[in-house]
Amino acid sequence: MQDPDGIDINTKIFNSVAEVFQKAQGSYAGHRKHIAVLKKIQSKAVEQGYEDAFNFWFDKLVTKILPLKKNEIIGDRIVKLVAAFIASLERELILAKKQNYKLTNDEEGIFSRFVDQFIRHVLRGVESPDKNVRFRVLQLLAVIMDNIGEIDESLFNLLILSLNKRIYDREPTVRIQAVFCLTKFQDEEQTEHLTELSDNEENFEATRTLVASIQNDPSAEVRRAAMLNLINDNNTRPYILERARDVNIVNRRLVYSRILKSMGRKCFDDIEPHIFDQLIEWGLEDRELSVRNACKRLIAHDWLNALDGDLIELLEKLDVSRSSVCVKAIEALFQSRPDILSKIKFPESIWKDFTVEIAFLFRAIYLYCLDNNITEMLEENFPEASKLSEHLNHYILLRYHHNDISNDSQSHFDYNTLEFIIEQLSIAAERYDYSDEVGRRSMLTVVRNMLALTTLSEPLIKIGIRVMKSLSINEKDFVTMAIEIINDIRDDDIEKQEQEEKIKSKKINRRNETSVDEEDENGTHNDEVNEDEEDDNISSFHSAVENLVQGNGNVSESDIINNLPPEKEASSATIVLCLTRSSYMLELVNTPLTENILIASLMDTLITPAVRNTAPNIRELGVKNLGLCCLLDVKLAIDNMYILGMCVSKGNASLKYIALQVIVDIFSVHGNTVVDGEGKVDSISLHKIFYKVLKNNGLPECQVIAAEGLCKLFLADVFTDDDLFETLVLSYFSPINSSNEALVQAFAFCIPVYCFSHPAHQQRMSRTAADILLRLCVLWDDLQSSVIPEVDREAMLKPNIIFQQLLFWTDPRNLVNQTGSTKKDTVQLTFLIDVLKIYAQIEKKEIKKMIITNINAIFLSSEQDYSTLKELLEYSDDIAENDNLDNVSKNALDKLRNNLNSLIEEINERSETQTKDENNTANDQYSSILGNSFNKSSNDTIEHAADITDGNNTELTKTTVNISAVDNTTEQSNSRKRTRSEAEQIDTSKNLENMSIQDTSTVAKNVSFVLPDEKSDAMSIDEEDKDSESFSEVC
């Protein structure tokens, strides 16, 4: 059909739409006008029955921008135009419905048909091999989904199916756009059953897919897009917040600057307390400054402003009595907002009415001002030491001497609050200013009285001991006071037991007297018997007194001791209290045991009996105290190493843990002086103990402490045993330990630090790495071929990953404090040679391929040892000739061989050049010497003789060349492949021939320095520098 001008309407529609697209790609400025024109064109086309033509040409023109790259601004402008056009049509329909405008079915149908056909048309490119087309298609779908309300169910299913595929596209840019599309299909109600969905469920859920992307996608940008667009509710929030441990810096920072900031006050109520503490700790301790600053800004500005600047309320939300990160959080707040400090005051009336938050704030502000030398705040807000001791004593009396509280639950709550307040005041008191002697004595009295309380909690015991140490005149004074407190507690308990026994005996006597009064007629006989016994006792007493008076007493001292009543012992609970105080005291003592007799007496009376005690808790505390004493005296450590080893071998889990800690500490302090000697424990026995602990995966905590301790001892070169070190590395890669995250984390940090800290450490790794690799290859093969269904085949790393890790650890370029000799280091070459030596022992072709394909990660340099490079080349040639390799392995091995050949040629050329330079230098020196020694005629004679000698040398050289040519001919005739052993035999024979030739030349050189005789006035000159000295001696 044509218009009155004779132009085809279909063509006119194309020209009109094309003109709009042409103008729209130039700038965003006229898009509103272009959208109005497009709407007018569409309405006219529909009126004239050309709806399909408009849709066709619209689709056709949009298709033109699909191959454009991501950075092409023209494509982005057309995409914005399409999104704005569809949004405008949708907006008109919504506005008409709100104004109760009666829409015809045709008006709604036009819009729905246009959107339906356009999305279906665009989806045809979602499987395109061109990454740009896939990107533009999903970009269009993402902006369209933002601007439409409802779509057909069949179209919805088609979209979900397509997006489900594109979320795993190989291009990150495409996956990001797929994430943007999926976020439009999230259903908040579906997240309630997020964890109950199965992977094979046909009804695909967008939220579950986004959760999978946020956890597993390798691209940081894709994870970021999923994190920022995932619904934030109780079910999805843990997956969002775990991005605080993302490997990408930006993702970690956005958790604090976007996610938590957008939650506002909901953070304190919607996030679980332990997760909340972890987020603060991770943010403030992040290795990147930008992440730390984002976390500080969140605490000091966003959260504080959300709470209207109420610092006390912020501390309440942080739950200072429970949380362990509040100290770091409040320090970050003071650093970011120093203006807050000047606004905080502690009036006199508040000191007797501390709350948990105020007590914590007092401690935090005092320590912050002390660390940062803010003396004005210290002088204005904080009392003198004597006043502080009064306040501390006030709360101690409230906690331990207040018995008027009737409500048990309220009493429990008050007790915890008071203990926390006492702890905060004590922490501040440890570093308080005690220049006033009155204040020091007052605080010391309060602290000693507090430590004498038997009901004191362990945290208060610990801080109380530390405060007493800071108040002591010297360490001897501190030990004296601490042991006095321990002895007083024990003596009080024994005295209390004696009093209780006296009371019991008095009650028994009263009962006996009552029973005597109520006796019947048989009582007369009993009275007679009692009278006889009393008479016997009186007579024996008189005889004993008489013997003593007359000096006839024959009673021995042993009899007296045996007749003494047994010594009372403190109760188990009291022993635990004493051991707890002594352990915290010993942690602060540095004086050798030989100079402190009080600790030696404490060993005899408290610690040694505790180690022999059968109660587990007492024995564990006794071993801990014994270990702390061993750190003060090497002889004591030597004497008790066997006991500590037995505790590790035979004790329960907690005793093993403590004993392992003690053994590691003893080695750290005293080194190897405690083993391998007369009366000492054998070091091999201790190594076996560590070996057994590392192999026992039933005690993961003990594995961790053994691994960390061994790594420290190896790092300090206290332990140097290769077998034990090999056990450490094998434990790291063992699949049995893959679930022990603490152990794997300890190894992942300690092993690289050890290898890169010193060349000797890297050499130890190189010596053991080949055997480690072989063992792990065998283990991996057994794991993969296992028929047991419970075996997790993914629990162990593949051999190629392990090989890469070992190469990385033995790379000399990774050493700290590198010197110029790093390029000459052959430690990695030695490891690779060892690997090629054991290559034949590996039976699995798959494992061989894994090793060969990663062999080129080795560091090669022309400055490395020539013989080592030559040996590596020989083993590589041997494998290439005798092993049946696939193309990939062959190419990798050929690359290594080519690199080695080029390096060897370079070394040879450099050696030849250096030899020539040395010869030239030597000739110049000899010429100057000869010129000074002989006249011109003698020099002419010498030159003539030198020519003759050169001719002889030329003949000798030709002979050598002929010999080598014959050898080459022989080698070519025997063209079969030689084994490694045959090649070594041939090399040996060649070396013998060369030696004989060299011997001949040596004889010639030795004879060369002879003065000319009568028959010949010629004399040859040797090339060695040292021969000039011989010549001068002869002259």
From Swiss-Prot:
A biological process term (GO) from this entry: tRNA gene clustering
One MF annotation (Gene Ontology) recorded for this entry: chromatin binding
HEAT repeats: 113-150, 153-191, 201-239, 597-635, 827-864
Keywords: Cell cycle, Cell division, Chromosome, Cytoplasm, DNA condensation, Mitosis, Nucleus, Phosphoprotein, Repeat
Pfam families noted in UniProt: Cnd3
Compartment(s) where it occurs, according to its Swiss-Prot or TrEMBL record: Nucleus; Cytoplasm; Chromosome
Main location: nucleus
Bias (Basic and acidic residues): 909-919
Stretches of the chain forming a coiled coil according to its record: none
Keyword Mitochondrion listed: no
Region (Disordered): 500-536, 909-934, 959-995, 1012-1035
UniProt subunit comment: Component of the condensin complex, which contains the SMC2 and SMC4 heterodimer, and three non SMC subunits that probably regulate the complex: BRN1, YCS4 and YCG1/YCS5.
Other known facts: Present with 1920 molecules/cell in log phase SD medium.
Function: Regulatory subunit of the condensin complex, a complex required for conversion of interphase chromatin into mitotic-like condense chromosomes. The condensin complex probably introduces positive supercoils into relaxed DNA in the presence of type I topoisomerases and converts nicked DNA into positive knotted forms in the presence of type II topoisomerases. The condensin complex probably also plays a role during interphase.
Name of this protein: Condensin complex subunit 3
Species annotation: Saccharomyces cerevisiae (strain ATCC 204508 / S288c) (Baker's yeast)
Lineage start: Eukaryota, Fungi, Dikarya, Ascomycota, Saccharomycotina
